[in-house]
């Protein structure tokens, strides 16, 4: 299992309790910050199942929880009920055969987490290399969004720009 690198605290508003949100492998978990109990209204009794693992700290933007996953993607969930609102997929999975075996040639995962400009509603994330890390022969081309810094407009649900470092 992959390590988790943080959580986010949401201070109580109105009658609600303060909450903690954190990834737990293929789950996004919400607990009450005061007593450690699951927030039952969030997802399935406090847990949202993810398609792929998330290992970095989430962020709160407006009424949403924002996470990155190894799909690779940036995903936005309603912080009250855990419903997936939208996602930005960073790199489509590509499978190729090599010597009779099937390999995943995607990658470009946002391992390092992301920064959030709350005022402007922009998430800035960084990505790693494209898949089959030590041999690039089977992944020719630009490998869009791999080894990149990407700015995503959370209000308008779109990419603003990307800068590929290599």
Where do the PLM segments sit?
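Repeat-blade elements of multi-bladed beta-propeller folds
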Residues: 2-27, 53-74, 102-138, 148
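Extracytoplasmic/lumenal domain signature
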Residues: 1, 13, 28-52, 74-104, ...
């Amino acid at each position: 299992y992959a390590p988790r690198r943080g959580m986010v605290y949401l201070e109580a508003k109105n009658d609600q309790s303060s909450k903690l949100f954190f990834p737990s492998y293929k789950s996004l978990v919400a607990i009450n910050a005061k007593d450690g109990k699951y927030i039952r209204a969030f997802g399935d009794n406090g847990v949202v199942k993810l398609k792929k693992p998330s290992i970095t700290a989430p962020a709160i933007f407006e009424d949403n929880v924002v996470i990155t996953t190894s799909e690779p993607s940036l995903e936005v969930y309603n912080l009250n009920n855990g419903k997936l609102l939208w996602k930005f997929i960073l790199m489509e999975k590509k499978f190729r055969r090599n010597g009779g075996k099937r390999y995943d040639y995607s990658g470009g995962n946002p391992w390092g987490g992301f920064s959030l400009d709350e005022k402007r509603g922009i998430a800035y994330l960084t990505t790693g290399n494209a898949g089959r890390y030590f041999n690039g022969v089977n992944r020719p081309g630009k490998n869009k969004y791999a080894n990149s810094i990407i700015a995503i407009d959370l209000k308008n649900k779109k990419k603003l720009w990307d800068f590929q470092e290599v």
